[in-house]
Amino acid sequence: MTTIFYAEPELVIAYGRKVLFLNPNDLQIFKDIELPADLTSCGLKITAPEISEEQQSTSEGKGTDGGKVEVAILNVCYSPDRQLIALTTAGQKALLLYKSRPEHAKLLSVRALARASSAMTFAADSSSVLVTDKTGDCYQYDCVEVNALPRLLLGHLSIVYDILWTPDQKHIITSDRDDKIRVTNYPATFDIHSYCLGHKEFVSGLALLTEEHLLSVSGDKTLRLWNYLSGMELLHHDLPAPAVRLHMRELLPAKRYQAAVQFYDHIEAIGLYELEQTNNIWTVACEQLVRAEAGSWNISNFALTSDMIYVAGAVNEHLALRVYNASDGEQAKTVPAGWLDMVTGSFSDQTCVPEDLSVWFKKRYDNVSDYMERKKRRIEGQQQK
């Protein structure tokens, strides 16, 4: 899985066992993190009783068949105060916490995860981090007492694709494969505050606009805006294709925002939507589609800045990075090709296999049609006798 996001002034790219922190303005590499092939060499231990024997075998660097387990980064997240970096891994499933300052990242802790992570976010005060896994559970990990055991906060019945923690830390917002958006009270996470219901497919991305407004995108080809405290839908906008990624920029506080959406299997790879609030009514003021040479390469993820769109993908099973103007969607000519080659060259020793997003869609089975067809053949057979 390729991770890329922009946290001003840094562009963060992660794939395989490596994370790069870049400054796209002066074309410099701030720092990098490279994980060892075996995380036990940097302190991975099994401490949680609920972790299975399979996880223990992988934590020792071997799979259940005795082969070597490939460590791969799944999620990367900066803390709000920019002092901490959290990342999760597959293979040897772990949560690693780094101190990001000074220049070189310093490893603070390595904690085993019971299952592969699906999403992650920090508390507003950077005191803890929430990690959701592929079975729908959400755990809280302390960033101060790094040896403290994780706390199970909530659970879904399907994989959680995105998670937000409101700035006042009173609500945790999660979205899942079963088209639900849940708003859970915190710290009393046994109490569900509200649901935002209306999507018909997986909800792939969430973004907070104001202290009560939430943006969501889904595989049902819609972008929706909610008052998440009441669960009321305030805006419904049709998209040209299923949405699999969402990034958001604030243009004018509480008034105007830009949402960038990555589409699944569409000739236009990315859509830019400007959302505007006037007299408490939200509208899509303008929209723009960016092709990003879709179809000529496998696009995995993207990052949005004030003037550029950085798109990561795969070409011939190697990581590729291309840059487009946010204003017109054309390929940026101000970014030197040599710099892009330098960045992707840092990952040249790793095979880049695109994530299969088709598994995000729910499979529907029509048993009635099969039954009716068998019944029809049986009746026809009886009539021929």
Swiss-Prot record:
Choose one Gene Ontology CC annotation of this protein and give it. nucleus
Write out the pathway annotation from the protein's UniProt entry.
tRNA modification; N(7)-methylguanine-tRNA biosynthesis
Biological process according to GO: oogenesis; spermatogenesis; tRNA (guanine-N7)-methylation
Entry keyword set: Cytoplasm, Developmental protein, Differentiation, Nucleus, Oogenesis, Repeat, Spermatogenesis, tRNA processing, WD repeat
InterPro entries per the UniProt record, alphabetical: Trm82 (IPR028884), WD40/YVTN_repeat-like_dom_sf (IPR015943), WD40_rpt (IPR001680)
Highest taxon of the source? Eukaryota
Subcellular localization is given as: Nucleus; Cytoplasm
Give the tissue specificity: In testis, it is present at high level in hub cells, a niche for germline stem cells of testis. Ubiquitously expressed in all testicular cells throughout spermatogenesis. Ubiquitously expressed in all germline and somatic cells of the ovary.
- What PROSITE patterns does the entry give? WD_REPEATS_2, WD_REPEATS_REGION
Q: What else is known?
A: Wuho means 'no progeny' in Chinese.
Q: Give the protein family.
A: Belongs to the WD repeat TRM82 family.
Q: What's its job?
A: Required for the Mettl1-dependent formation of N(7)-methylguanine at position 46 (m7G46) in tRNA. In the Mettl1-wuho methyltransferase complex, it is required to stabilize and induce conformational changes of the catalytic subunit. Required for binding of nanos mRNA and repression of translation by the mei-P26-bgcn-bam-sxl complex. May cooperate with mei-P26 and nanos to derepress the BMP signaling pathway. May cooperate with mei-P26 to suppress expression of a subset of microRNAs. May cooperate with mei-P26 to regulate bam expression levels in germline cells during gametogenesis.
The name this protein carries in UniProt is tRNA (guanine-N(7)-)-methyltransferase non-catalytic subunit wuho
Q: What is the lineage of its organism?
A: Eukaryota, Metazoa, Ecdysozoa, Arthropoda, Hexapoda
